[in-house]
């Protein structure tokens, strides 16, 4: 594999702009090659190419890293004029000094320093959490044979915690953890838990499956909170109340800390990957430059970079440390891991941090040798292997078999479905086939079509480098390691999901074909419902690869239940995303009423939308569910914008479907027509504007090259490497999407102005429903792309790892027992990880917060809203926690990394 492809495969999507632009460098070298060849042809004399002293070796050693070079300093170096030709000196100045060092290396080094700053802050939080965990474990050990209230335990725990916060916290963690680990408490088991009652068991099952209802965190104090400072607002909530700490056990705390440490360890691996692959890229780029321009700059460049840039210093220290360890292993010398890592913190901080958290994970958070062995094995699986793609994907690529089944199944199904559509459209309008079979089976077709188009969306995101899996799942699961960042089609699991969907499409096509042929709904309608139920409940061994889609089946069922009970649960990505998709499936949902009407005593000719109120009620449900989700988001975060405005939008959606139903039931009377047109017009205008401005973040930019578009357009391909602009032809897809979305939003006009025969036609309803599904297909592409853009601007690559104990600002010792209620539940990402712009010379301009709690001083309402609009889409949901807190010990992963990919 070429290094450029390897860099593309290994690059973390959210950090892609911070890597060395290797392909641009190759294009520059090709241009230099052409100039050199042209000069060689024009030259009549032989030109000797001799190795030289570096152009920038003497002139730049006096320059501090990060400061810009003056042209006079560079051109005044004596070595600059001595050995190279004029063209060579021009290339060295333009490529190595102006582009590679001043731009590319400075960019990578500054971002690496920012990552190190973030790693240190998260490490301090975890260090504090381990200290509290040790105190709690000591407390429970000392009070094992006597009872004490949970409130007293929390108070004494944090009193001791505040008293013990000092510079020697690392040593206290080590000593405290060793005093309670299995070494000094041989095989000590926790007190036997009493048998759970039926109610407690049901609550536990619901909590494990994210189905336990919860009160909004800010629901009862929302009016008072509206006047509080913005720093206390916008916090996310999960399925835990303010008294979370009062019921926290050491096992629950250990599980939460284990998940947080795993995610932090994986984050360190990603930082190390970023550093190492960039160092390799710079070395290879200078080597290519030497080969193209006949120079010998590699040695001097590497020496200069190791001296002046932290990126190269740490990479070189890591190589030396690995070599030292290998030498000690081969010579059978003891390796003082702790002492060595402590001495290397300044030289190689990533390795030092890895050593510390490995010690915590395998010692402080284990109760037995078995737990230690399990945790050690778990960390080993998280180590990045650059050859993972070639070794695992191409040798045992099961996706080939899965795609073969998909191709055969969908190919046959499309033939049968097309024929049934022909029969339904060509049948008489009063026939059972046209009025009953065509709408009912058409509703199933819409559900399967939107599922198939969603997987097409996944392929588009996969090809354009959009990290949709992080957005969908909320975080990187530990058992999957770093495979999400390996850009191979087999690792995307798209073939597996298509394989899963094929088992629903093929039976639907066969059953619908038989139903149309026999002109009967019974028993084929019930048969297909039974097949769908069986496929969701099917044991893993009956269908090949069915054990690989257990999580998918469970996720669909759980998310659908959470959607139907919107308002009782915090809104996660899957909840709001599935809700938006179902808003485009009102045609299918309304058919549920028709299905029951067919088997009731009602005549079949009265089961259509022109006679059924139930169909109108069901068509309002998707908008109602999203309305309740918006209210829950407002109750959780306390931010009226954009959640209340979004709720108003879905209120118009309910009004639109209700007035459409009333208009149909009134036999298209003028009295009902006017309210319908008013509601439909308002709904279309607001939803179209919301799609473009809020969900897609369009129509903000009127000055740059991308008129009305964002600055980052992943579907437009690569930017021009010379001027940084996108090709206009590639940007047209965004403008077409904007026009398409607006046009389909106004498709209701057909019901208002078309002749009555067209309005009442089942074919018209089917076509309009199909257009809405296609509009949603386009909407999904740009909605997820916009979410990815937000993650890129925030450099967000991990989810929220919940922590068992309150956290304070890093370096802030002012937390006391009064904070237990307000900070009872925290996450590793609650701390301010952005470096200070005043104290850090390598700072980044991050985007404006996606939401604001209170209006800041000297800012108007309009100014606050206008600043929030570009990032408001990120507040539609809150990221799920890493794991549900329970009393179970960490379980062994059900499948290996290889099995999870294949």
UniProtKB/Swiss-Prot annotation:
Its main location: membrane. Keywords: Cell membrane, Membrane, Phosphoprotein, Transmembrane, Transmembrane helix. The modification Phosphoserine is found at residues 172, 179, 859-860. InterPro entries: EXS_C, SPX_dom. Belongs to the SYG1 (TC 2.A.94) family. May function in G-protein coupled signal transduction. This is Protein SYG1. The lineage of its organism: Eukaryota, Fungi, Dikarya, Ascomycota, Saccharomycotina.
């Amino acid at each position: 594999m070429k290094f450029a492809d390897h860099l593309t495969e290994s690059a973390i999507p959210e950090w892609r702009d911070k890597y060395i632009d290797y392909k641009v460098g190759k294009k520059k070298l090709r241009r230099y090659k052409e100039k050199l060849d042209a000069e060689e042809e024009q030259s009549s004399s032989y030109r000797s190419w001799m190795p030289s002293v570096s152009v920038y070796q003497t002139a730049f050693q006096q320059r501090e890293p990060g400061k810009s070079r003056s042209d006079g300093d560079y051109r005044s170096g004596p070595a600059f004029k001595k050995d190279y030709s004029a063209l060579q000196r021009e290339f060295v100045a333009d490529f190595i000094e102006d582009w590679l060092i001043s731009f590319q290396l400075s960019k990578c080094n500054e971002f690496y320093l920012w990552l190190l700053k973030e790693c240190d802050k998260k490490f301090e939080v975890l260090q504090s959490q381990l200290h509290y965990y040790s105190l709690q474990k000591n407390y429970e050990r000392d009070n094992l044979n006597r009872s004490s209230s949970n409130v007293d335990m929390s108070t004494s725990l944090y009193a001791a915690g505040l008293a013990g916060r000092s510079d020697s916290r690392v040593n206290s963690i080590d000593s405290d953890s060793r005093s309670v680990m299995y070494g000094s408490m041989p095989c000590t088991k926790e007190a036997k838990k009493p048998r759970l009652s039926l109610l407690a068991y049901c609550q536990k099952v619901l909590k494990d499956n994210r189905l336990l209802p919860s009160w909004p965190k800010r629901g009862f104090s929302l009016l008072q909170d509206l006047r509080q400072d913005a720093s206390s607002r916008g916090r996310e909530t999960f399925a835990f109340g303010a008294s979370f700490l009062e019921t926290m056990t050491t096992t629950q705390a250990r599980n939460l800390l284990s998940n947080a440490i795993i995610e932090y360890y994986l984050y360190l691996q990603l930082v190390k990957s970023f550093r190492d692959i960039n160092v390799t890229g710079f070395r290879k780029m200078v080597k290519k430059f030497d080969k193209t321009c006949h120079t010998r700059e590699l040695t001097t460049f590497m020496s200069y970079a190791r001296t002046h840039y932290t990126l190269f210093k740490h990479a070189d220290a890591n190589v030396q440390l690995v070599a030292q360890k290998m030498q000690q292993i081969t010579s059978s010398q003891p390796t003082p891991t702790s002492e060595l890592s402590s001495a290397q913190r300044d030289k190689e901080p990533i390795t030092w941090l890895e050593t510390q958290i490995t010690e915590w994970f395998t010692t402080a958070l284990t109760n037995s040798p078995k737990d230690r062995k399990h945790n050690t094995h778990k960390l080993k699986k998280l180590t990045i292997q650059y050859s993972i793609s070639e070794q695992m994907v191409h040798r045992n690529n099961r996706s080939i078999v899965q795609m073969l089944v998909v191709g055969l199944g969908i190919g046959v199904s499309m033939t049968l479905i097309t024929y049934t559509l022909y029969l339904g459209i060509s049948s008489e309008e009063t026939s059972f086939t046209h009025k009953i079979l065509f709408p009912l089976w058409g509703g199933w077709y819409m559900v399967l079509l939107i599922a198939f188009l969603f997987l097409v969306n996944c392929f588009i995101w996969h090809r354009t480098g959009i990290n949709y899996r992080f957005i969908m799942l909320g975080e990187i699961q530990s058992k999957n390691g770093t495979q999400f960042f390996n850009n191979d089609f087999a690792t995307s699991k798209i073939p597996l999901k298509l394989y899963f969907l094929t088992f629903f499409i093929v039976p639907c096509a066969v059953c619908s074909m038989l139903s149309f042929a026999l002109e009967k709904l019974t028993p084929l309608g019930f048969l297909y419902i039974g097949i769908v139920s069986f496929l969701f409940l099917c044991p893993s061994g009956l269908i090949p690869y069915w054990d690989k889609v257990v999580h998918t089946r469970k996720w669909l069922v759980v998310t659908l239940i959470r959607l139907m009970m919107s308002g009782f649960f915090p809104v996660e990505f899957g909840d709001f995303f599935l809700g938006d998709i179902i808003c485009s499936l009102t045609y299918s949902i309304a058919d549920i009423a028709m299905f029951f009407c067919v088997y009731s005593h009602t005549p079949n000719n009265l089961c259509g939308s022109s006679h059924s109120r139930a169909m109108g009620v069901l068509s309002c449900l998707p908008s109602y569910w999203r309305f309740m989700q918006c209210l829950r988001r407002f109750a959780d975060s306390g931010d009226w914008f954009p959640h209340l405005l979004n709720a108003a939008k879905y209120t118009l959606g309910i009004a639109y479907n209700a007035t459409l139903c009333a208009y149909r039931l009134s036999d298209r009377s003028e009295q009902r027509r006017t309210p319908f047109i008013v509601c439909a017009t308002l709904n279309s205008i607001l939803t179209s504007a919301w799609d473009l401005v809020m969900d897609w973040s369009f129509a903000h930019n009127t000055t740059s090259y991308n008129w009305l578009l964002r600055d980052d357009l992943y579907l437009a391909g690569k930017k021009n490497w010379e001027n940084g602009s996108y090709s206009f032809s590639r940007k047209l897809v965004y403008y077409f999407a904007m026009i398409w979305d607006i046009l389909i939003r106004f498709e209701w006009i057909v019901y208002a102005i078309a002749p009555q025969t067209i309005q009442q036609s089942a074919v018209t309803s089917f076509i309009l429903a199909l257009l809405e599904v296609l509009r949603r297909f386009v909407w999904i592409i740009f909605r997820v792309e916009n979410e990815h853009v937000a993650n890129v601007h925030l450099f967000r690559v991990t989810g929220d790892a919940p922590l068992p104990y309150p956290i304070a600002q890093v370096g802030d010792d002012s937390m006391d027992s009064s904070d237990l209620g307000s900070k009872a539940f925290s996450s590793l990402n609650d701390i301010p990880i952005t470096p200070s712009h005043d104290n850090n010379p390598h700072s980044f301009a991050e985007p404006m917060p996606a939401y604001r709690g209170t209006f800041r001083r000297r800012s108007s309402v309009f100014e606050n809203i206008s600043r929030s609009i570009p990032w408001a889409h990120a507040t539609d949901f809150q990221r799920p926690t890493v794991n549900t807190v329970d009393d179970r010990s960490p379980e062994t992963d059900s499948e290996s990394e290889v099995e999870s990919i294949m």
